[in-house]
Amino acid sequence: MGKTKKRKQSITLIEMMVVITLIGIISGALAFNMRGSLQKGKVFQTEQNCARVYDVLMMEYASGNLSLKEVIANKETLLDNSAWCKEGKKLLKDAWGEDLIVKMNDRGDDIVVLSKKLKSEQRG
């Protein structure tokens, strides 16, 4: 009886290219979806920062020691020294690293906190 040799089946170059192409397509789809989620996360974080800055500054104003103009002028110091938040200066940045805008409203009776980048993201 003759011995039969078993041949090893190897992967051809074409099969390997097909697998790599499929991996690339799947990775691209995941990366595209991830980008949208990251943008939504930045929008949410910026909205939360704006709300927290507003709340802390209005609490300082409500304490009765400072006028609205003084609160806005001293926002960095007030946020850093506030018992209501940690790392107050970090709150004055949006998720894209740009400074938040803190100003008085048109009537002069309230504070407005906004982000230029957030406005452009919400429009687009």
Curated annotation (Swiss-Prot):
The keyword Signal applies. It is found in: Cell outer membrane. The keyword Amino-acid biosynthesis does not apply. GO terms for cellular component: cell outer membrane. It holds the Pfam family N_methyl. Residues 1-31 form the signal peptide. Keywords: Cell outer membrane, Membrane, Signal. Its main location: membrane. It comes from the Bacteria. It is a peripheral membrane protein. NCBIfam families: IV_pilin_GFxxxE. This is Putative outer membrane protein TC_0858.
